[in-house]
């Protein structure tokens, strides 16, 4: 199975958390149907990724080999465009990455309820979901940051969902993820 990849890079800070100084592989997938239909997220900075034919079509096995050659760090963030525009391919990619023991963060402009309704299979294979359209009017700047994990979102309307033992927990307002690894935390949970 092939997936349309725009680029891959080693990134820190914006790609999410990792125990390796927050350095993760960031995989950019091509295609955003919403933008191509004339409704991009206002202020989207990834317009080169809107074209579903952009980048290159690659076998998923080759993509995984490429990622493993980049680093022995097993932390990856999948962004776009809109990754879920390639839903069957993303399910297969995340499934195989999870089999290789990767920690996976997926960004999508869909809300968690939309993902559950139309894209639920991908939730079985990811560790965190960042949901919601980027909103330039609610953009978060470095000067706005507070301690915790909020630096991984681009605008304040986006939510961070953590897969805690098969339940997705809204951890957007958390300062520390340790309680979720240890079984605590009193945030909104969504059972799959």
PLM regions and their residue ranges:
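Structural preference for beta-strand elements that scaffold enzyme active sites
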Residues: 24-26, 75-77, 103-105, 128
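Conserved alpha-helical substructure of the radical SAM core
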Residues: 39-76
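N-terminal [4Fe-4S]-dependent radical SAM core
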Residues: 1-53, 184-185, 190
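Conserved glycine-rich "GG(E/T)P / GGGxP" loop and the immediately following alpha-helix
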Residues: 73-97, 141-154, 159-168
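Flexible loop residues that form catalytic
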Residues: 49, 81, 133-134
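Charged phosphate-binding loop/patch that engages nucleotide di/tri-phosphates or the phosphate backbone
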Residues: 159-192
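Canonical radical SAM enzyme core domain
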Residues: 50-65, 84-123, 128
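Non-cysteine beta-strand/loop elements that form the S-adenosyl-L-methionine
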Residues: 127-136
């Amino acid at each position: 199975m092939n997936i349309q990849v725009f680029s891959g890079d080693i990134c820190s800070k914006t790609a999410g958390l990792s125990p390796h100084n927050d350095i993760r592989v960031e995989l950019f997938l091509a295609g955003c149907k919403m933008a191509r239909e004339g409704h991009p997220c206002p202020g989207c900075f990834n317009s080169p990724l809107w074209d579903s034919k952009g980048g290159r079509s690659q076998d998923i096995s080759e993509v995984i080999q490429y990622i493993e050659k980049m680093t022995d760090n097993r932390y990856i963030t999948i962004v776009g465009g809109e990754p879920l525009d390639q839903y069957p391919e993303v399910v297969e990619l995340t499934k195989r990455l999870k089999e290789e023991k990767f920690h996976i963060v997926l960004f999508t402009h869909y809300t968690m309820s939309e993902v559950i309704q139309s894209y639920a299979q991908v939730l079985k294979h990811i560790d965190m979901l960042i949901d919601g359209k980027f909103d330039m009017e609610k953009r978060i700047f470095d000067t706005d940051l507070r301690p915790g994990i909020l630096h991984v979102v681009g605008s304040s309307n986006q939510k961070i969902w953590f897969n805690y033992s098969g339940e997705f927990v809204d951890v957007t307002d958390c300062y520390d993820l340790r309680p979720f690894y240890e079984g605590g935390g009193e945030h909104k949970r969504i059972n799959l």
